Amino acid sequence: MGAAGDVTGYDMPPLMLTPDEIEAAVLGAQWVAGRGDPVLAKAARDLISKIASAVPERLRPYVLEPATGAPPAWTTAPDGLDIARTRAWIHAGRKIRLDYRDERGTVSQRVIWPVTVGYRETVRMLIGWCELRQAFRTFRTDRVVEAEFLDERHGQRPGQLRTRWQKHLEAEHAAWKAQTP
């Protein structure tokens, strides 16, 4: 069973990729291999191997000797929760209870409806609807003290929740632009 809990894989129809598309896929996979959670990082390395074995010989240098590269993130902070399981809960539309330590060291308990896991250069972020604050919030995964993966569903399809979050981001950005000279 895959990380999402319901899909293990499938046979992808043949794709005709340009050299630029191959390099883009490899670059993205390199970045994830260096910064993703262990399950996603392994999947990214496997993807590069699959691309290398599937492309014609004349295109293999774009995979094995690309002109672009993503250096590994040597200082990624350790996560306080299982990110692969978090991704599965996002797909399933289930809630997560967090004991979360803020930047001042204060610990609070939050129940969130997880939306997405975001990646910064050295830290991962969990974005979710916070029941306590009744708003979308961003939680650094290295500040999670404890996580309980609840069986309770939050009642929205993951795509609907993500759309709400994206609209929230757009509104925040518009408000910021209106205040910026």
Kindly label every feature range from the protein language model.
Residues 1-181:
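Short glycine- and basic-residue-enriched patches
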